[in-house]
Regions:
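Protein-protein interaction/assembly regions in multi-subunit complexes
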Residues: 1-161
Length: 161
C-alpha cells in the first residue's frame, strides 16, 4: 500500500503541493491483510472505490507561536473502513510520531485527502518494500566498502594556485 492520489484542499505552508504529495507517497503504510484490497487495475470503478483503495485524511493547523511539525501519525484512516489495519502509517520511532511531513508556522494550515492503493514496485518505487536506511559519514573509508582514494594530508596533496 502507498498513497497514490492526493487531493489538497488547503496548503498555506511554504512547501509546494507536489513536494508534499511526493513525501506522502513515500510514507510506508501498514499492509497487514492487504489481500482484502484488490489492485486498482483489476477493479471496475472509474478511479478508486472502497474495494481497491484506502482513504486517509490530514488536517493540521498551527495556532501557537511555536513551529508545529506535521507527522505521519496525523494521517487518519477513514473510520468506515472495515479493515482498520490496512493503510495506517508505519511508525517505528520510540516517540510514536512517524515521518515528518512538513512544518507549519502560526496561521498556516494543511488539509488534504489521500487515497492509498495497492501496487507493485514495477509500476512505481513507492510500492517497493522499505526498511530503515542509515547513513554514516566515513571520511577515511575505514569500513573499506569501496577502494576509493582518500586524502592523507590536504595541504600536501592539493595544488594551491
Amino acid at each position: 500500500m502507498a498513497i497514490d492520489l492526493v487531493e489538497i484542499e488547503a496548503n498555506t505552508s511554504v512547501l509546494a503541493d507536489e513536494f508534499i504529495s511526493h513525501r506522502l507517497g513515500l510514507i510506508p503504510l501498514n499492509s497487514k491483510n492487504v489481500d482484502d484490497v484488490i489492485y486498482s487495475r483489476d477493479c471496475d470503478c472509474e478511479q478508486y472505490c472502497e474495494l481497491c483503495s484506502v482513504t486517509l485524511t490530514l488536517h493540521a493547523r498551527c495556532t501557537g507561536d511555536e513551529i508545529m511539525r506535521v507527522y505521519a501519525r496525523d494521517l487518519v484512516v477513514d473510520p468506515l473502513r472495515a479493515n482498520q489495519w490496512v493503510g495506517n502509517p508505519v511508525i517505528t520511532d520510540p516517540e510514536g510520531l512517524g515521518t515528518v511531513i512538513c512544518k507549519l508556522r502560526k496561521g498556516q494550515e494543511l488539509r488534504m485527502k489521500c487515497i492509498a492503493k495497492k501496487g507493485i514496485a514495477k509500476e512505481h518505487a513507492k510500492w517497493a518494500p522499505t526498511s530503515a536506511v542509515g547513513f554514516e559519514y566515513d571520511p577515511q573509508n575505514k569500513l573499506r566498502h569501496t577502494d576509493l582514494w582518500y586524502e592523507e594530508d590536504a595541504a600536501k596533496e592539493w595544488y594551491v594556485g
